Amino acid sequence: MKLNISYPVNGSQKTFEIDDEHRIRVFFDKRIGQEVDGEAVGDEFKGYVFKISGGNDKQGFPMKQGVLLPTRIKLLLTKNVSCYRPRRDGERKRKSVRGAIVGPDLAVLALVIVKKGEQELEGLTDTTVPKRLGPKRANNIRKFFGLSKEDDVRDFVIRREVTKGEKTYTKAPKIQRLVTPQRLQRKRHQRALKVRNAQAQREAAAEYAQLLAKRLSERKAEKAEIRKRRASSLKA
């Protein structure tokens, strides 16, 4: 069985192949999310604590959290669930998934280091994998570099070098939610537009109410005139 161990602190991961079944027996009958002491796997993992995060069986079917079985099962899967990505809106599909209980039929078991042990693991805990991209949002850039609101975040955005043919240039992401004079001007303009539209609507409503009152008074006067004529004709 292969153990795909990740170390989120350094952003690194490494696969260890273990042929001796007695060493991996400690994982059997454990579920996704449970923690396991690494000393039972080998002396190099002494002091380490691993959390089971997933895996695949020998046919490539992924383990699914919440399925309390050590075998494969077919489930009707929908949007926003693991092991399935719908291609159309509202699409559902019955797919085979492996249960969340670890067994000997697994080819790869994914583990996360929760607690670091005594000695370093070569290529895993002794190396740091830098993030390829830096923060993009203005507030996150400020938080990342410890800037105040007065500092210009555009000077601190992380640029990366790109080589195209013989030409080398730098690229930087577009800073999101950056407050600039243009943005404030646009906001003021939109607010003024809103106020202007509301004022125009109020004026139009007042004009309509005035016209309606005029029409109603005219109709009332007409009806009163008709009643007066009718009363005078009856008297005659």
UniProtKB/Swiss-Prot annotation:
InterPro entries: Ribosomal_eS6, Ribosomal_eS6-like, Ribosomal_eS6_CS
Phosphothreonine carried by residues: T163
Numbered residues of crosslink Glycyl lysine isopeptide (Lys-Gly) (interchain with G-Cter in ubiquitin): K116, K131, K149, K214
Domain of life the protein comes from: Eukaryota
Gene Ontology biological process terms in this record: maturation of SSU-rRNA from tricistronic rRNA transcript (SSU-rRNA, 5.8S rRNA, LSU-rRNA); translation
GO molecular function: structural constituent of ribosome
Signal peptide boundaries: none
Keywords, ordered alphabetically: Cytoplasm, Isopeptide bond, Nucleus, Phosphoprotein, Ribonucleoprotein, Ribosomal protein, Ribosome biogenesis, rRNA processing, Ubl conjugation
Localization in the cell: Cytoplasm; Nucleus, Nucleolus
Gene Ontology CC annotation, any one: nucleoplasm
Record PROSITE patterns: RIBOSOMAL_S6E
Similarity section: Belongs to the eukaryotic ribosomal protein eS6 family.
Assembly description: Component of the small ribosomal subunit (SSU). Mature yeast ribosomes consist of a small (40S) and a large (60S) subunit. The 40S small subunit contains 1 molecule of ribosomal RNA (18S rRNA) and 33 different proteins (encoded by 57 genes). The large 60S subunit contains 3 rRNA molecules (25S, 5.8S and 5S rRNA) and 46 different proteins (encoded by 81 genes). Interacts with snoRNA U3. uS11 interacts with MPP10. Component of the ribosomal small subunit (SSU) processome composed of at least 40 protein subunits and snoRNA U3.
Function: Component of the ribosome, a large ribonucleoprotein complex responsible for the synthesis of proteins in the cell. The small ribosomal subunit (SSU) binds messenger RNAs (mRNAs) and translates the encoded message by selecting cognate aminoacyl-transfer RNA (tRNA) molecules. The large subunit (LSU) contains the ribosomal catalytic site termed the peptidyl transferase center (PTC), which catalyzes the formation of peptide bonds, thereby polymerizing the amino acids delivered by tRNAs into a polypeptide chain.
Misc remark: Present with 66000 molecules/cell in log phase SD medium.
Official protein name in the record: Small ribosomal subunit protein eS6A
Record gene name: RPS6A
